[in-house]
Amino acid sequence: MKRQKRDKLGRAHSNGYQAGLGGKTKEQCPYQNIDAKSQWLGGWRDAISDRNLGLFK
């Protein structure tokens, strides 16, 4: 049985989180679709928050 791919919105959130940890700005969001962009920005915000709390360096 094949594994299912993760949904696109979940992947957008994860990519945004990784971008935030990597120090990218929110203007570097690669998504044009409003839902995917919203998820990416949510992940980016979570990562910035985690970095500010000292969870990541």
Curated annotation (Swiss-Prot):
Instruction: Tell me where in or outside the cell this protein is found.
Output: Cytoplasm
Q: Identify the Pfam families for this entry.
A: RMF
Q: Recite the UniProt keywords alphabetically.
A: Cytoplasm, Translation regulation
Which GO terms of type biological process are on file?
regulation of translation
Q: Which Gene3D superfamilies match?
A: ribosome modulation factor like domain
Q: Which residues form the signal peptide?
A: none
Superkingdom of this protein's organism: Bacteria
Question: Coiled-coil stretches, from where to where?
Answer: none
Entry GO CC: cytoplasm
The role this protein plays is: During stationary phase, converts 70S ribosomes to an inactive dimeric form (100S ribosomes).
Record NCBIfam families: PRK14563.1, Rmf_CrpP_fam
Q: Which family does it belong to?
A: Belongs to the ribosome modulation factor family.
State the name under which the record lists this protein: Ribosome modulation factor 2
